[in-house]
Amino acid sequence: MRFPWLRNTLKTGWEQVKHYFSVRPATFAAAFWPMITLSVLLYIRYLPTTNYIFDEQEALLGNPYLNQPTFKYGDAIYRDFWGLPANASIGSYRPVPNLLWRGLIEFGERGQALIDNNIPAAWKVSYANLHESMNPGRPVETLPDLMKKSWPQHLFNLFFHGINGALFVAMAYRLSRRNLVAWLAGTTFVTAAILTEAVSGVVGIADVLGGLGALLALAALSTRAYVMPFAVFSAVLLGLFSKESAIVCVPLTPVAALLLSHLLHPDKPARLVRAGLSLVGAALAFIVYVELRKRWFPSSLPSELAEGLEPGSSAASHYMREFMVWFHQAPLPKDRLNNPLVDAPPDLRVAGACRVYARGLSQVVFPWTLSGDYSYPQEPAPTELIFPESVLGWFMMVGPLGLALGLFVLALKREWKHREPLRPHVVHPFGVGLAQWFTKKSRHSQIEKQTPVIALWERRLFEVAVIFGTAWLAYKLNTVGPSEMNKDFGDKELDRNILFPSHAVNDLMAYGACACLFVGGLVEGLWKPRTTAATDYRLPVAALGLVWLVVSYFPHSNIAVLLPTVRAERLWYFPVLGTTMVIALLLSAGFDRAKELRRWGSYAWIVPTVFLTFQGGRAYLQSTAYRDDLIFWRDTKNAVPNSAKAHLNYSVMLGARSRWQERLEESLIALELAPDWAMAHVYTGDTLCRMGRPEESWAYYKTGFDKGPNDKGLIVLGLQCLWDTKHLKLHEEELRALSEAH
């Protein structure tokens, strides 16, 4: 080799990389930067061209909380995800994402003030001249304006998705003690292509943060018994205030404790006790969340709950109604275009939901086709109960639960038969790493002698911080009362508004905390330590993954509750937490099996590499659709050609670029797919009107006004163009007839 120094450098670098990933313990600190880097490389949007895409216009541009200076920073708890009040909400109460978005905007405001007060005027003039030369006619944007754009806001998604991947790595290493399994788990999750919508789209931050709460709740199970309920409480509360889907953590966290306690605490597993303690922590978080949401965001009841049950209803029906009234979920919109299952009878609705589930699950494994929209008639209501996809979906929803139960029983049987002597847990205290960094020595005799002491004090400080921090947080949240801006909202009738007084919530939390401290202390202090334990992690983790998949998907399935949308890929963020556990185990098993083959053992790395490369490649390609709104809707309508909404939105983006003939063609496709959709008729008429063909537009306008008589926005849009082209008077009689008819 002509350049031996280059060869030596590459060899040394390769050895360091191998040591980092195969020898160094796969802790959260070790996985932090690799997972965030991978997240950024796969999902970051193209800065020069990206703009507000899909729901981002409503979430950022149209959000009153973000754009009106009359709102204080803390007022996020009194508004829904879109910044709307309780009487105008569509049921999405997620204050944590709004706090993040507003925080970035306020950071821009403070930064702009520093610039205005400290940058010389001559520099500002020079910058303005440079900006004008590069962007003629465009005003200079301020920092707050830049912070409101989708690109800086979506950096939150990239960061927290990487954090979730790092948590996966750390938890997998804690359970398996294998670097291979740990890195496969984190990489499988971060590269899951079906999550592209949640990570690349700004609105997906709710799903990402909800997933963060779920992963933190799982990580909390590794803490000591008297700390664990407090950590679970905080984690679940974070998830719930980020997205309502985190409600699945209430049953799933105890299941995880039941399945994994013997691996996380091999000397004192106490399965049932730890599962009970985690249930207390998660249930208390759920109760506090519901009570605070009702206090801060007093919405009305859905119409189906506002009416009483029919005489003769079962006791179970009465209990369920009482629970739903107490839960007090804001009414969800029901639009046949976004969710065709709203008009389907219960049996066909379940069949359609099973079909959607089967298709989504196939995308998790083989994401060849991905889309940002699946509106009517792409996912129509089925006309028959039994067909291949409904049967497959039902089997994949019920089968994993039965398989998980069988795996759990088999794991218990193996645990009793095959035990190994306990190995001491190697700790890596943060303080030791910090001391080694300051002394510039990876091994220092005096530091290594103090490692157990440093680890003990770090653990104690962490436990005290978790217990007292959680208690302080719960108390402070419970002291925040309702807002005057919401005083006239909500149900005033007592039978529709079940509320607990704040002192009762305080008492409940205090008694629960004391009970958890007492029981947890008994477990850690009096439980007889084991000297042997089962170390096989595969069956319990696989069982948890299967249960997690089904249970976490069920709230999104449209079986129990009809959602505003029939299908969305971002809704798979929670279920993919479960599929990741199973897929990582399969990949590691495939690698190990291939490694044993005499001829092909050296190529075992191909097994996980092919799968992860395909997933990462599809994730990257799908993220390129977020370059701008035109590309997004073009790729969407190509992926789901039967979605009327995709074609119509693509036509709007074409019209914004004055490509009128193409807009007309796409509008007509949308109209053909959804002939009863008022918006498609009006938008087609508006296209013809703006093309200078107002005579042809009237037939579409008239049909659209007749099909959507209460949609003022559509009516104003049509009348405006008719007025501009001096054709409004020509149709005055017909307009008055429509007005009288409706």
Indicate residue ranges for each PLM-predicted region.
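Polytopic membrane enzymes that build or remodel cell-surface glycoconjugates and lipids
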Residues: 2-683, 690-692
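Alpha-solenoid repeat scaffolds
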Residues: 265, 597, 711, 728-729
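Boundary/linker segments of alpha-helical solenoid repeat arrays
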Residues: 644-645, 678-679, 709-717, 742
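Long amphipathic alpha-helical scaffold regions
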Residues: 666-674, 699-710
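TPR/TPR-like alpha-solenoid helical repeat scaffolds
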Residues: 713-728
